[in-house]
Amino acid sequence: MSKRSLDPSDDFKGQKRLAIDPESTALEQDRQMLQQLSEQNSELEPQNVAPNAEIPLGFDLSGIQFNMTPDFYLRMNQGMDYAFNQPNPIATPQQLLRTSLIPTLGNLSNIILSILGKPVQEASAIVTNPASEMGMAFTKVMNMFRMVKDIYTEESFIYSSAIGMRTPSQRSTTRRANLAIFLAAVYGALQIGFFHLNENFLEVFAPDESNILTNQGTLYMELKTQAYISAMAQAERPKGDILNDLFPSDMAHRFLIRRNAKLDDKLTYVEKQIIEKCTARKERLANFSPQEALNEVYPWGKFLSEIACYIHNNYSSISAIPIPANSFKRRSKKNGLRFKAGEAESSPSESGSDLTDSLAFGIPSSTFDGSSETQNVSSVVLYDQVRHMTNNNLNNKRTRRVANRRSWTKEEEEALLDGLDLVKGPRWSQILELYGPGGKKSEVLKYRNQVQLKDKARNMKLFFLKSGQVVPAALQCVTGDLRRD
């Protein structure tokens, strides 16, 4: 058997030839480096190398493709195919930091929403009086929020898709953060101009191409009005240019592009309403005289009140933090209740809504023992408080559910109670006008009819009576009492 001549360059060149295009000029430097290494290895003394010996590389090169092109590291970070076939993409340090700070971003956003979700006078006093106890606490929270937010983006708002926040919990957190940014800017705690607020409104309040609700459209129009008043006060641009920027003639086209619809598709009912109202508002602003009196017709305080009303109606769903199914199961077993995993995931806001509602609107967790104390408290908060207090006294027995009956979600219960408060009693058709199909405020109750509203309201009233608590004024006119039931 003849001896094999030792020529390391053949092995290196052979392996290199498997993965590298010989005509590639970008790898010329790598070839030269390997050639020098081959020449150095060829100078090894023959007596130090055993016959038939292979080069002791220390690892197996077979099946491994070399890729030292400039896009190698980019491919690694983007999770594409790259050398060594790693099973998972390698995240950048910045991405790891953003992921680890998601809980912090969510907690700070919840605190800001809870403070700015208070009545307008109370929230304004906190923001404008940094020397007060609450003002100092809010200032510290805002400072921490700015530092954490800058880790995610230097823009005014956080775009989750642009920074790789793709999981449901991450997107939910960035949505709450954007809402906190918007409200802080409205109250003057963050320096963001009306232009950016107007441009990002739909992304903040109706993200991920979701349908715009009627109350969101009202806020959208009022924001444009306040932006116009502010721009006219600065007197830097002609009135017509400002109106055309805020109320463009191609709003219908923009709505379709926003939700990736075809240009020949029809607008939704709410989108048509928004365009009609914005067109009328634009004409009124253009013909209004004197312009200085606009502040009296469209006061800033009214806009703040509408923002606060939106928070009141949507805070629990916006700031609900997803809870793992296993932790929900453990808590359910402790209370003697049994749920399926799908049920636990479908209503994550129920677990922490009592705490967040109390935090947002300053409602104490003590028992309400008199009707005078409940006059200024919404039925939603009262219902949550009583349910929270009675959860610890529930028996292990649970009524068997009817298979074909659709259980009420927390959002539906809140909409029903809010509707009872707004229409001042059991006016079921009016409640459906607010929350039913094409509702003026939302479509939470679009799958409910008047009979279902009546039955649910009756059960809610009985719930208060059986708990020994004062029935809210909105439920007092609902049929049902303990003597008959």
Swiss-Prot record:
Pfam family, one: Myb_DNA-binding
Domain of life (superkingdom): Eukaryota
Principal location listed in the UniProt entry: nucleus
SMART domains named among the record's database cross-references: SANT
Compositionally biased region (Basic and acidic residues): 1-20
Listed PROSITE patterns: HTH_MYB
Coiled coil: none
Keyword field contains Cell cycle: yes
Disruption-associated phenotype: Cells arrest in interphase and have an aberrant chromatin structure.
Example GO BP: telomere maintenance via telomere lengthening
UniProt-annotated stretches for the region Disordered: 1-23
GO annotation, cellular component aspect: chromatin; chromosome, telomeric repeat region; nucleus
Compartments, as annotated in UniProt: Nucleus
Entries under InterPro entries matching the protein: Homeodomain-like_sf (IPR009057), Myb_dom (IPR017930), SANT/Myb (IPR001005), Telomere_rpt-bd_fac_dimer_dom (IPR013867), Telomeric_DNA-bd_trans-reg (IPR052833)
General function of this protein: Binds the telomeric double-stranded TTACAGG repeat and regulates telomere length.
Subunit architecture: Homodimer.
Protein name listed in UniProt: Telomeric DNA-binding factor trf1
